[in-house]
A protein has these predicted regions:
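Catalytic alpha/beta core domains of metabolic enzymes, predominantly
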Residues: 256, 263, 274-344
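Conserved, mostly hydrophobic/aromatic
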Residues: 71, 77, 136, 149, ...
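Metal-dependent enolase-superfamily TIM-barrel catalytic cores that perform enediolate-based chemistry
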Residues: 152-264
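Bacterial Sec signal peptide processing site at the extreme N-terminus
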Residues: 23-33
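Metal- or metallocofactor-binding catalytic centers and their adjacent structured scaffolds
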Residues: 34-45, 61, 73-75, 79-148
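N-terminal secretory signal peptides
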Residues: 1-2
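N-terminal export signals
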Residues: 5-24
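Flexible C-terminal active-site loop/helix
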Residues: 11, 34-50, 68, 76, ...
Length: 382
């Protein structure tokens, strides 16, 4: 379908699916104070730097750590957990997240089940700060799920047996390191995700293909600049067993992306071009599908609305993540039975996870029956 037709229907579908400088708080190993009996919501948060198992390289940068803020939301002695993870491209920081959370007065709320009221208030505090908002959204969902005694996939009526396989990400590296990482992952995952976008793309794909024939997804992270060359590359990638391509061109090249999508033999999925629900109508027709990430869209509530809107437009849906603990990854996984693709491996890339949650069994996501977002805090870890 031509993009102009998509744009017209997108506006209707989006409207119909709309659902539902401050110093950060210091880290502490002391348990969170229990406010049982006062009937109010209480928010605690602290910085927590994520240590990556390997240097992570994409088209625009490399890093060994990811800044993160952990959040705890307590009501009547029950605590829900959330987090804000902030890779460089998100444009947010520990300082900005802590400043936002510092001004969020959640103690005014006495009923955590009024989730829309709470999250609407939070969203009204600023036009941005998506990761900070997601942290509270996740913690609130965890809290309410615990109070209800059920995981959110069950509350939403989703079948956990329909959770898809998740990709495992291979960052940009030398052919030798790529082969080593691929051998580590190929026996555990049914599909691998490869970061591309540099002149070394074909060498990386050939290195992977020298050790495994497992299907691949590729993510250019806006790294390709010429649409004709990108199309040639996509035809070559299809011959190598690639099944989808994420964000091939820069976000300001929407018309070129629409041209590419119309001609591509593989699904083209928006990543950096999509953040919130309101973005779907803007990019509809320029991509075959969208990659929803909680840190971009402000959390689980909006992610669910985005799934509904994309489905109404006939678009493919992927659930993605940043490098995160099992807290945010397990929160996103609650929606996984409703999507086509999952890229929920962020917790597997870090060495200092604070939680146990969703696992991978024979390459597929395995959702625990633990109430809330499906996590258990690891003892003696903050």
């Amino acid at each position: 379908m031509k993009r102009r037709v998509f744009l017209k229907s997108a506006g209707l579908a989006a409207a119909g699916a709309a659902l539902v400088g401050c110093a950060p708080v210091r880290e502490t190993s002391a348990p969170a104070k229990i406010h049982k009996g006062d009937g109010r919501l209480h928010l605690r948060f602290f910085p927590y730097e994520l240590q990556l198992r390997h240097t992570f390289t994409v088209a625009s940068y490399s890093r060994k750590t990811t800044p993160d803020v952990q959040v705890e939301l307590t009501w009547e002695g029950v605590t829900g957990y959330g987090e804000a993870s902030m890779p460089p491209y998100l444009g947010q920081s520990v300082e900005s997240v802590c400043a936002f959370l510092q001004k969020a007065d959640l103690s005014q709320f006495t009923d955590p089940f009024l989730m829309d009221d709470i999250l609407d208030y939070l969203d009204s505090l600023s036009p941005g700060d998506s990761a900070a908002k997601a942290a509270v959204d996740i913690a609130l969902h965890d809290l309410v799920g615990k109070l209800l005694g059920a995981p959110w996939y069950k509350i939403w009526g989703l079948n956990p047996a329909k959770a898809p396989s998740t990709t495992f990400t291979i960052g940009i590296d030398t052919p030798e390191v790529v082969r080593e990482k691929t051998l580590e992952a190929a026996g555990k995952f049914n599909i691998l995700k490869v970061k591309v976008g540099l002149d070394s793309d074909e060498a990386m794909i050939k290195a992977i293909r020298s050790v495994t024939s497992v299907p691949l997804a590729v993510d250019a992270n806006q790294g390709w600049k010429d649409r004709s060359k990108a199309l040639d590359e996509i035809f070559w990638l299809k011959e190598q067993g690639v099944v989808l391509v994420e964000q091939p061109l820069p976000i300001d090249r929407l018309d070129d992306t629409a041209w590419l999508t119309e001609r591509s033999p593989l699904p083209i999925i928006a990543d950096e071009s999509i953040q919130r629900l309101s973005d779907i109508s803007r990019i509809a027709g320029a991509f075959h599908g969208i990659n929803i990430k909680l840190m971009k869209c402000t959390g689980m509530r909006e992610a669910r609305a985005m799934v509904s809107t994309a489905r109404a437009l006939g678009m493919k849906v992927m659930l993605g993540c940043m490098t995160e603990t099992s807290c945010a990854v397990s929160a996103a996984a609650q929606l996984s039975p409703a999507v086509d693709f999952a890229d929920l491996d962020g917790n597997l890339l870090i060495a200092n996870d604070r939680f146990r949650g969703v696992t991978v069994s024979e390459g597929r996501l395995s959702l625990p029956s633990t109430p809330g977002i499906g996590i258990l805090k690891i003892a003696n870890n903050y």
